[in-house]
Each structure stands twice: as structure tokens, then as C-alpha cells.
Regions:
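Glycine-rich adenosine-cofactor-binding loop
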Residues: 1-18, 117-138
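NAD(P)-binding Rossmann-fold cofactor-contacting core
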Residues: 7, 140-160
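Residues in the short beta-alpha loop(s) of Rossmann-like NAD(P)-binding domains
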Residues: 8, 69, 149-151, 203-205
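A short, well-structured beta->alpha microelement
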Residues: 14-29, 52-53, 163-170
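Residues at the starts of beta-strands that form the adenosine-phosphate
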Residues: 21, 26-27, 62, 120, ...
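Phosphate/diphosphate ligand-binding glycine-rich loop within oxidoreductases
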Residues: 40-101
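Adenosine-phosphate binding glycine-rich loop
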Residues: 79-118, 205-247
């Protein structure tokens, strides 16, 4: 049995994928949204309290979510269930980052009037998403400037011929045509962003208070839901397989 608290094509694709894998017929799988909650109490886009999920743990049950609290995970385990927090699954995070970067490139190619080689893109953050996005943009011929607080990263980028600047309030953005934020925390204040600069924010939360930006949180679920669902399904499959090997 598979019960999903997320609706839409991503969840449908995940369920379809899991329906094809070899697993114990008695195994129950509970899929919680990605991310699972915003307020720490209710499941995202529902009126269901997250602790109500505990009532579904009957026999061998796997609960899969994203950003789950320690207390919730402990409660699941105390009832005999198993917990997969996708936030701790590096393979999932990498695959999701690749999809996010690919979606972002798709947005740029379909909403700008210039070829990549004629655009200078500022990428804020050089984590999983920022790194893959930078590589894709460079491959397409775009000019890229990476904004990151890590001095070692800036040194490495410089050795590869990639422009970079320290992420701070007085960073120079005068030569940037487009700014893409991948960092989870606010770095630039609205007054430091050049007037008229297009800003795309891939992170959740309000990172550019007072500034109009294009928000694309969880963009794979919107643009590539079938692939996003398979990434989700593969994570659950790995978890189940690992549990079987360790049993």
C-alpha cells in the first residue's frame, strides 16, 4: 500500500515507479510532501497535523518526508516504522539539484531574447544547485559570475577561468544582466540590487524583501514532474533495498 499526502504529477510518477519495483506486499509506504511542512505542525498544502501520520504506522511502514523533526522521526520508530528524510539523502539531493538547474536553464532559454553567449548571469551560491547551474550555463556559452562567501571556492573558480565575487551587501553587480539565487539565506538587500535587474529566486522563503523577484521554489515538480517523481521513487527504492540488505 502506498499513501501520498502530496497530489499532482510528481507524486503520481513516484507512486507509478514504486509500483514497479520488487518489494514485500505487506510493506506500507507513506509519502509526505517535499518539503513536508512549513509551520512544523501541519502537512504542506493540507489541514492535516503531521502527528496524525503516526496513526498510519501499522506493521512494516516506511514514512518518507523532507525536513522531518527529530521528535517526529523518533515517534515513527517507536511505533515500529522506518523513516526516510530526503534531506539526508545525498543522492536524492544531487539528482534534484540537477533537475533544478536544468529547469532554470529552460526558463532562461524560453524567456530571454538573447542567446546565452550574449548574457552575463550572476549565480548566488555554489552549492549543489549553484555548481550544476554554473556548469550548464558555461557549457551553453553564457558569461557567469558566481557570488559565494567561500574564499576557497572563489580561488578554485578563478583557476578555472570563472569570474566570482564575495557574497556581501556591496558586491558589484553592474555588469550582470540576470541574477539567480540558489542560496537559502538572504545575502543581498533590495537596495543593493541594481534597478531593473531581473532576479530569479530558486530558494524558499523571502530572500529579497522589498524587491519584486521571480520565485521558482521546487521548480522540478512544476516543470519536470515525471522526472522529479522518479527521483523521489528511486530514493525510496534505495532506502528499502538498504533496509533489506541490513535485515
Amino acid at each position: 500500500m502506498i499513501h501520498s499526502y502530496e497530489n499532482g504529477k510528481r507524486a503520481e510518477s513516484c507512486i507509478e515507479y514504486l509500483g514497479r519495483i520488487e518489494r514485500d506486499d505487506t510493506l506500507r509506504i507513506v509519502l509526505l510532501p517535499i518539503p513536508t511542512t512549513r509551520d512544523g505542525k501541519t502537512i504542506l498544502n493540507t489541514k492535516v497535523y503531521i502527528n496524525e501520520v503516526l496513526d498510519e504506522i501499522i506493521g512494516d511502514t516506511v514514512v518518507c518526508g523532507y525536513g522531518l523533526t527529530d521528535s517526529f522521526c523518533e515517534a515513527v520508530r517507536s511505533r515500529g516504522g522506518r523513516v526516510l528524510d530526503l534531506l539526508n539523502d545525498e543522492d536524492f539531493l544531487i539528482e534534484n539539484a540537477e533537475l533544478t538547474a536544468l529547469c532554470t536553464v529552460g526558463i532562461l532559454l524560453t524567456t530571454t531574447e538573447y542567446a546565452p553567449k550574449d548574457v552575463t548571469v550572476g549565480v548566488v551560491g555554489y552549492g549543489r544547485i549553484g555548481k550544476r547551474l554554473t556548469n550548464m550555463l558555461l557549457y551553453l556559452g553564457a558569461n557567469v559570475r558566481v557570488y559565494t562567501t567561500r574564499e576557497s571556492t572563489r580561488t578554485d573558480l578563478g583557476e578555472c577561468g570563472v569570474a566570482s565575487s564575495k557574497s556581501c551587501c556591496d558586491a558589484d553587480m553592474s555588469d550582470i544582466d540576470l541574477l539567480i539565487n540558489t542560496a537559502p539565506a538572504a545575502i543581498f538587500s533590495a537596495e543593493k540590487i541594481p534597478h531593473g535587474l531581473r532576479v530569479i529566486d530558486l530558494a524558499s522563503g523571502e530572500n529579497f524583501a522589498g524587491l519584486t523577484v521571480e520565485k521558482y521554489p521546487s521548480v522540478p515538480a512544476k516543470m519536470l514532474p515525471k522526472s522529479a517523481g522518479r527521483v523521489w521513487g528511486r530514493a525510496v527504492e534505495r532506502f528499502i533495498s538498504a533496509a533489506c540488505r541490513n535485515a
